[in-house]
Design a protein with these regions (language model features):
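Glycine-rich "HGGG/HGxG" loop immediately N-terminal to the catalytic nucleophile
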Residues: 84-97
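The alpha/beta-hydrolase serine catalytic core
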Residues: 4-31, 151-219, 263-287
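Conserved alpha/beta-hydrolase fold motif
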Residues: 123-124, 146
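Alpha/beta-hydrolase-fold catalytic nucleophile elbow
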Residues: 149-150, 231
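Short, surface-exposed "cap/lid" segments of acyl-processing enzymes
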Residues: 31-85
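Gly/Ala-rich beta-loop-alpha elbow adjacent to hydrolase catalytic centers
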Residues: 124-133
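Conserved acidic catalytic loop of the alpha/beta-hydrolase fold
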Residues: 104-121
Length: 304
């Protein structure tokens, strides 16, 4: 069910046609304008294509600023919209329809399209999409560089010893709507105007389900991506850093697997979302150059 099904496009023209079709479908789907899938394209296949996948309840605009900088540096940049995200109605319950199968099929499609946009494929995701990046890194050998920012492998308030038990329990719970901040609700200052201020718990459960799946795969076989980097916020308030470290260890138990770590220091006192420009308390002018530098340094490193 969660086996990757690669079907790469043949060329740049086909890749652009696929993205155009995605955008047209989203335009009919009441998607907020800034949340429609973005493609910053040089008109031809470039050496590198960078896929930037927005976080849970956010939308492609989250990565727009970072994406433009990668584009100006010479890469094609693909910023897709995850299923059921970015709709004009911020209080929609559409996310209740999201499944782990939707996420893996979506991820496969992105990598397939990327083949026409760049000779080498880089994919980056944050939070829930960081979990998807982990699944892609586990299953797709055609990924050259995978970056997972604060991936959701567990929740910070759940002790590591109880993570697997918690994941199995939440799969059985009925769905209900949760605010990111129950005090401010729809007026949450940390939830920017194009992101959802809350979510159906069933959608969060599907990301946890995906985490369980990729963890089970990692116990059986090594990741297929060539280079993997985990980006960890040492002051992370939402996802479990302990589970991220455990997952890195799980991967590195396999022969010839090295997972790099990049840490944003605890002294920075960052919130969970370190990507969205305009988020209170996030020094974007400091964070973006570091993220760009990490990718640039790996891209320029001679192949072994």
């Amino acid at each position: 069910m969660f086996t990757s099904r690669a079907n790469p496009v043949a060329n740049h023209e086909e890749a652009v046609a696929c993205v155009t079709a995605m955008q047209a479908a989203e335009d009919q789907d009441l998607t907020r304008d800034v949340c429609i899938t973005k493609l910053y394209d040089h008109g031809k296949q470039t050496e590198h294509v960078i896929i930037l996948i927005h976080g849970f309840t956010n939308c492609p605009e989250q990565f727009s600023e970072l994406g433009k900088q990668h584009f100006e540096a010479g890469s094609n940049v693909f910023i897709p919209r995850m299923p059921y995200h970015g709709l004009s109605d911020r209080l929609t319950d559409a996310l209740v329809n999201l499944t782990a199968q939707d996420l893996t099929a979506f991820g496969d499609k992105l990598i397939d399209i990327a083949h026409g946009l760049g000779k080498k494929i880089t994919v980056m995701g944050v939070s829930g999409s960081g979990t998807l990046v982990a699944w892609l890194a586990q299953n797709r050998s055609d990924i050259d560089f995978a970056f997972a920012i604060a991936p959701l492998f567990g929740l910070a308030f759940v002790p590591p010893a109880f993570t697997k038990f918690f994941e199995r329990i939440v799969l059985l719970l009925p769905n209900f709507y949760m605010w990111w901040d129950p005090r401010t609700k729809a007026n949450n200052p940390y939830s920017i105007y194009y992101a959802y201020p809350g979510y159906p718990t069933r959608a969060l459960v599907e990301f946890l389900r995906l985490a369980m799946i990729v963890r089970a795969q990692a116990e059986k076989f090594p990741p297929k991506a060539r280079n993997i980097t985990m980006i960890i916020n040492d002051s992370e308030p939402a996802v479990s850093n302990a589970e991220i470290v455990k997952f890195i260890d799980l991967w590195q138990r396999h022969e010839n697997v090295t997972v790099s770590e990049v840490h944003f220091e605890k002294e920075m006192n960052l919130p969970h979302d370190i990507i969205t420009p305009g988020t209170p308390g996030v020094p974007i002018a400091e964070i973006q150059p570091r993220l760009i530098g990490v990718i640039r340094d790996l891209h320029s490193k001679p192949e072994s």
